[in-house]
């Protein structure tokens, strides 16, 4: 029995990056031998075990064969006679198909096992598929796109790009389960350059199949005085990259991605203006979130940002009453943390524009001041003072908030 560290751990070590997680392959062993060494079985489709002390995952070397469309249509074979190279050949990219032997004390020993040229592709900054079996798993398209968001200087090798397009044309992407699509998109959004993920998906045609709402934004013009980059799709990519650069959370990045969906449905005769696109964005966003089973935290923030981002940009023109109405519509008084994230997404929208990346955004501070003032109003005390007139409480609290905001930010009520 031999144990090898494989995949991302070897890749990242060669790139001089921190190794976050290690995956292990065990060659020449049976499930019974693993159990005898106190490894705990956890795999459903094929034998995966947890180390008794470190709880890291160890998988028996295996081969796989495509039996049906989609992500789940595979048949696995594992036995002591499966070699390391047979296990590595089923992996997606050459840069992920390298290994090093692990000694009994856990140290990496010996040379890098690199049967498919992964080290050369690392030096050339190329994503290249290992073999023809790449086409058998549509998730690999999403993984390549996600890796592009992480390693933004890498390019997809031409032959790999051709295979990805062929997979899309064959309908393989349509068989992906929504949860897996969301999982890969979410992970890509959290990488350093998420726009690269969408560029790769768009180039192979997959974006139009899994996120047609985003694909439709490319080529849609905007007013150049507001958007020097003009193209709505380009703008959205700049927005998500700005959000990533700031280290914003996944809900903020998803809201940044989806805030302008309605611009794709603007009638041609009114372009490049987009009057009312906020409401159309909400109408498109709801079914998108349902289709991909987007988590509630991401969906709820995205809906607030899609509906209100235009108003958030205009707060310097608002009086106190309009500011309070905006805070109430956004449920900022009850959910101030979510509203803070809405301001982050709005700021990313304002700065995700060509030449305006560092433009001041005083709107955020104005709204933070307004929210502090509005939340300081003692609604309970007002309610007690109107104990016999409950119908008047809501309006009285609202008026008190307007007065507080007017005083705090120095605007008329």
UniProtKB/Swiss-Prot annotation:
ATP binds at residues 8, 11, 91, 143, 146. Pfam families: HD, PolyA_pol, PolyA_pol_RNAbd. Keywords: ATP-binding, Hydrolase, Magnesium, Metal-binding, Multifunctional enzyme, Nickel, Nucleotide-binding, Nucleotidyltransferase, RNA repair, RNA-binding, Transferase, tRNA processing. Residues 232-333 form the HD domain. Mg(2+) binds at residues 21, 23. Transmembrane segments: none annotated. The keyword Flavoprotein does not apply. CTP binds at residues 8, 11, 91, 143, 146. Magnesium is required for nucleotidyltransferase activity. Nickel for phosphatase activity. GO terms for biological process: RNA repair; tRNA 3'-terminal CCA addition. It catalyses: a tRNA precursor + 2 CTP + ATP = a tRNA with a 3' CCA end + 3 diphosphate; a tRNA with a 3' CCA end + 2 CTP + ATP = a tRNA with a 3' CCACCA end + 3 diphosphate. CDD domains: NT_ClassII-CCAase. Its cofactor is Mg(2+); Ni(2+). One of its GO terms (molecular function) is tRNA binding. Coiled coil: none annotated. Its EC number is 2.7.7.72, 3.1.3.-, 3.1.4.-. Catalyzes the addition and repair of the essential 3'-terminal CCA sequence in tRNAs without using a nucleic acid template. Adds these three nucleotides in the order of C, C, and A to the tRNA nucleotide-73, using CTP and ATP as substrates and producing inorganic pyrophosphate. tRNA 3'-terminal CCA addition is required both for tRNA processing and repair. Also involved in tRNA surveillance by mediating tandem CCA addition to generate a CCACCA at the 3' terminus of unstable tRNAs. While stable tRNAs receive only 3'-terminal CCA, unstable tRNAs are marked with CCACCA and rapidly degraded. Belongs to the tRNA nucleotidyltransferase/poly(A) polymerase family. Bacterial CCA-adding enzyme type 1 subfamily. Comprises two domains: an N-terminal domain containing the nucleotidyltransferase activity and a C-terminal HD domain associated with both phosphodiesterase and phosphatase activities. Monomer. Can also form homodimers and oligomers. A single active site specifically recognizes both ATP and CTP and is responsible for their addition. This is Multifunctional CCA protein. The gene is cca.
């Amino acid at each position: 029995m031999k144990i090898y560290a494989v995949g991302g751990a070897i890749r990242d070590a060669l790139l001089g990056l921190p190794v976050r997680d290690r995956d292990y392959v065990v060659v020449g062993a049976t499930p019974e031998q693993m159990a005898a060494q106190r490894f705990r079985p956890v795999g459903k489709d094929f034998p995966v075990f947890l180390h008794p002390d470190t709880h890291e995952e160890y998988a028996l070397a295996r081969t796989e064969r495509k039996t049906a469309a989609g992500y789940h249509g595979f048949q696995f074979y594992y036995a002591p006679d499966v070699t390391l190279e047979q296990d590595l050949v089923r992996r997606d990219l050459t840069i992920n198909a390298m290994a090093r032997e692990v000694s009994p004390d856990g140290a990496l020993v010996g040379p890098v096992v690199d049967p498919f040229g992964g080290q050369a592709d690392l030096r050339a900054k190329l994503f290249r598929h290992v073999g023809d079996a790449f086409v058998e798993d549509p998730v690999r398209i999403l993984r390549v796109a996600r890796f592009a968001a992480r390693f933004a200087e890498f390019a997809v090798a031409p032959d790999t790009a051709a295979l990805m397009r062929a997979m899309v044309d064959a309908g393989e992407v349509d068989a992906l389960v929504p949860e897996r699509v969301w999982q890969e998109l979410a992970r890509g959004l959290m990488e350093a350059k998420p726009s690269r993920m969408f560029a790769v998906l768009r180039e192979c045609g997959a974006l139009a199949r899994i996120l047609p709402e985003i694909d439709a934004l490319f080529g849609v013009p905007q007013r150049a005085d507001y958007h020097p980059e003009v193209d709505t799709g380009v703008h959205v990519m700049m927005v998500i990259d700005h959000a990533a650069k700031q280290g914003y959370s996944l809900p903020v990045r998803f809201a940044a991605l989806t805030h302008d969906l309605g611009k794709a449905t603007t009638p041609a005769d009114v372009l490049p203006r987009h009057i009312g696109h906020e409401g159309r964005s909400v109408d498109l966003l709801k079914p998108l979130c349902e289709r991909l089973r987007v988590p509630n935290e991401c969906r709820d923030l995205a809906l607030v940002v899609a509906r209100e981002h235009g108003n958030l940009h205009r707060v310097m023109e608002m009086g106190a009453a309009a500011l309070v109405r905006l805070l109430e519509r956004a449920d900022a008084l009850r959910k101030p943390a979510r509203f803070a994230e809405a301001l982050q997404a709005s700021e990313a929208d304002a700065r995700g524009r060509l030449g305006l990346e560092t433009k001041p955004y005083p709107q955020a501070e104005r709204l933070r001041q307004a929210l502090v003032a509005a939340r300081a109003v003692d609604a309970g005390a007002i309610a007690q003072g109107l104990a016999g007139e409950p119908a008047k409480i809501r309006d009285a609290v609202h008026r008190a908030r307007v007065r507080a905001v007017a005083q705090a930010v120095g605007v008329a009520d």
